């Protein structure tokens, strides 16, 4: 067994002694290692592809421009705009990749007020929402009309008495920012995004509701996978690499929380970021 063939399994003896148990445990370890290496390999391949795309656009446009005999001023301006857009895309992608690899090194000892955090996200994204023609709102009411099942909060158990959570303010800000930005990007024209902060059974819930086209059931878990995009052409047009929600998922898990799609239909979707609440 070598690094290249970790999928190889040892034959488990037909017995119930320690050797059989040890062999079975060893095979399970190999399977986990093989899965981890495969995931890392796929992630690296996807990252390389995403990095290559803006570089290819830059190279192609520069080569075309180089062949022009006497470029006009408007052509220079178009070239500069393209370079600015593609370098910004590269910078954002590299920054997100670094964030995902450095999560464990960020201290998580801040006492974070979620209402204040959401307010800061709104201030920063207000120009983005205005440019997109999307209205953003904070809903501080104490009741919501949620369907009730094993994954969905019961309105009767919700309240607004959110205290604080302990974690990294920087990372939690990034998680909420990504959720709200995503809801703005993939919304309908003149749509809206509503954010509310609730508490249920010691869990703080940041609910982000949009008026987009919804997310199909088969994609509701996949959207949190790295590099996954429901509509690849639309995501590329908006500069997305499919890492925003994956980073949210990583940050949530790093704070002993979860993120998932609570409900989705043709009228829009609601995503919930759930985090443990502190009592101090």
What do these predicted ranges mean?
Residues 190-202:
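Short beta-strand/loop element within the Bergerat-fold HATPase_c
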């Amino acid at each position: 067994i070598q690094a290249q063939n970790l999928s190889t399994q040892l034959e488990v003896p037909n017995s119930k002694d320690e050797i059989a148990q040890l062999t079975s445990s060893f095979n399970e370890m190999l399977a986990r290692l093989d899965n981890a290496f495969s995931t890392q390999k796929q992630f690296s391949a996807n990252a390389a592809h995403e990095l290559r795309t803006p570089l290819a656009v830059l190279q192609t446009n520069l080569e075309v421009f180089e062949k022009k005999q006497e470029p006009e001023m408007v052509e220079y301006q178009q070239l500069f705009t393209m370079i600015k857009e593609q370098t910004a895309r590269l910078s954002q992608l590299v920054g997100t990749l670094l964030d995902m690899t450095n999560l464990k090194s960020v201290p998580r000892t801040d006492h974070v007020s979620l209402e204040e955090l959401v307010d800061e996200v709104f201030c920063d994204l207000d120009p983005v929402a205005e440019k997109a023609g999307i209205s953003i709102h904070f809903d501080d009411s104490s009741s919501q009309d949620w369907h009730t099942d094993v994954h969905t909060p019961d309105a009767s158990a919700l309240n607004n008495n959110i205290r604080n959570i302990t974690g990294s303010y920087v990372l939690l800000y990034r998680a909420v920012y990504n959720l709200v930005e995503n809801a703005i990007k993939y919304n309908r024209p003149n749509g809206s995004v509503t954010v509310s902060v609730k508490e249920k059974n010691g869990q703080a819930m940041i609910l982000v509701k949009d008026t987009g086209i919804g997310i199909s059931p088969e994609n509701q878990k996949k959207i949190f996978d790295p590099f996954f995009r429901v509509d690849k052409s639309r995501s590329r047009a908006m500069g997305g690499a499919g890492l925003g929600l994956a980073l949210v998922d990583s940050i949530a898990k790093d704070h002993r929380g979860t993120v998932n799609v609570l409900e989705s239909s043709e009228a829009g979707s609601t995503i919930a970021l759930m985090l443990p609440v502190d009592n101090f």
